[in-house]
């Protein structure tokens, strides 16, 4: 299910709303990429020729949220010195796994929320000055980490899939 709406609510102002409901599950998937009994303990292998093969049938696909929503507002205000452009967006995703394994606190996030905003003055002489904040809700820099399980030979890691909060000023001049 996808819903996309854009509304012009005033001179130079638009509101965008996007919503998706995604029911992405494996019909059949025998994961024989490793011996999964090291992670899950004893179970019946889905492939008799591959010890520790694990059936993911009916499981949700990784990196696919169940619900996704984006709300954004943009405004352009012409002035004597140039345009002032203001933008803000909020993104919400629910029940998202960052891998095939859904482990609470490691590879599964109940929600991922992102807030971005910026204000830009685009001067008539080709210079622009922009103040911005991206991923402003991630104060602890901990959004969307995932765990890679160690193999029998060792390894394992944490991976971050989204950048942390960034804020700053940017000046651009076009020659």
Go through each PLM region and give its residues.
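Short, glycine/charged-rich beta-strand-loop motifs at protein surfaces that mediate ligand recognition
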Residues: 102-108, 116-120
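Feature captures outer-membrane beta-barrel proteins of Gram-negative bacteria and organelles
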Residues: 69-71, 75, 117-119, 169
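Juxtamembrane/interface motifs at transmembrane-helix termini
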Residues: 36-37, 107, 149-151
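C-terminal beta-signal and adjacent terminal beta-strands/loops
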Residues: 91-101, 120-175
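Outer-membrane beta-barrel pore domains
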Residues: 57, 111, 173-175
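Gram-negative outer-membrane beta-barrel transporters
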Residues: 1-100
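Residues that define the transmembrane beta-barrel architecture of outer-membrane proteins
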Residues: 1, 65-69, 111-115, 163-167
């Amino acid at each position: 299910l996808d819903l996309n709406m854009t509304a012009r609510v005033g001179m130079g102002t638009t509101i965008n709303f996007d919503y998706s409901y995604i029911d992405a599950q494996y019909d059949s998937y025998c994961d024989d990429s490793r011996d999964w009994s090291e992670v899950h303990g004893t179970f019946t292998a889905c492939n008799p020729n591959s010890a520790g093969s694990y059936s993911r049938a009916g499981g949700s696909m990784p990196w696919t949220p169940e619900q996704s929503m984006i709300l954004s507002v943009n405004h352009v205000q012409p002035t004597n010195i140039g345009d002032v452009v203001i933008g803000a967006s909020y993104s919400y995703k629910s029940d998202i796994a960052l891998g095939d394994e859904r482990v609470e606190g490691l590879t599964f996030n109940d929600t991922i929320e992102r807030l971005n905003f910026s204000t830009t003055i685009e001067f008539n002489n080709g210079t622009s000055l922009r103040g911005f904040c991206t991923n402003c809700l991630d104060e602890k820099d901990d959004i969307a980490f995932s765990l890679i399980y160690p193999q029998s030979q060792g390894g394992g890691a944490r991976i971050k899939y989204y950048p942390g909060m960034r804020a700053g000023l940017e000046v651009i001049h076009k020659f």
